[in-house]
Amino acid sequence: PNIILIYADDLGMGMLGCYGQEIVKTPNIDRLAKQGIMFTRCYSSQYCCPARASLLMGVHDSHSRSYTQTNGGLVITAEQQGWSNEELEKKAARAARIKPSGGEVFLPELLKKAGYVTGQFGKLEWGFTTWHGELKRHGWDRYVGYMDHQRAHGYYPSFLWKDGERLPLPGNTHADGGKTPEIYGPGATEKRRGNRDGKVTYAPDAMLAETLKFMEENRNRPMFILFSTNLPHGPVDIPPAENKYAGHPAIRQAYAGAAGGNRECAGAAEEYASMVAKLDRQVGAILAQVHKLGLEKRTIIVFSSDNGHELYYRTDKERGRGLNCHGGVLDGTGELLDVFRGSRGLIGQKNAMVNLAGLKWTNHEGGIRVPLIVSWPGTVPH
């Protein structure tokens, strides 16, 4: 069968309707859950890099030194200093801090040997910087996206990478993708966020288009696709026309009573909700393409996320994360003003909703418990 793995970025399980989300609507992901299996206890890592390495290599992130974690920002520097592709390739390869042993096995490599054509679209590999030679060594026939995960936190890069070449994104002028600070607040940060100069082509749209094209081109071959989108990783950034939750009454009401500068954060929360909804629409586009190509009965679709929930819609992400001397809950959801309760999870025989302790960057439930849905109509029971 074809295998399509949709891998969200920083998406807490509580942000999806099928896992109990009440404000943000995710009908396409909910449909996947309804027609397949929805896991309530799937565990990943506390942040992106080790989670993605485990996914692609099958190694436990704490027990193996065989994967290479590099520093981020190299592609940003390359653009600012005018490096050629060849210069960047050499510098990226030299930047590897943990040298691979040479005996590793990679998921796309195995599937390629089994006759699959392999494609990765989005936030490439595990980061924080990868390069063409590494991607080919791992078994990817086609790739389009960000080689630099630091740059992937900006949604309007001037180019993406496509099979070793730069794929220009029209109208974009920012070497760092137009990234703004990850915490939200009034003043200079908000002014910069509101400046749309050099922000024309939304990178997730370009990566989705390349994914759908790859599916069309390989409809008669077994495909493995890793759609590793950077949605909804912060800082919040969505095309204004797609800010579907602007002025949402439940969000506005929650923030009206917030303390201090957090009263100014309702707009960020609305944009974050719109980013999750955008992710859901992209899942819907992939499902529609599967249907259009007549591939439903021979396509396994897996949906998951790299780690637990993160707060990108308040003025201070860190307050409340520490474990108190009495062993109290880490994230203090009420204090942190998470109107979405993105760290919620299903628990118990009746799947009651609870607030999970911890967020991204912690090894507590809210940081490492992630959504997992598997759908294969006619084969996987629902």
Features from the language model and the residues they span:
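Active-site-proximal cap/lid insertion segments
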Residues: A8-V24, R31, T40, S44-Y47, ...
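Active-site segment of extracytoplasmic enzymes that catalyze sulfate/phosphate-ester chemistry
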Residues: M13-Y116, T130, A152, R166, ...
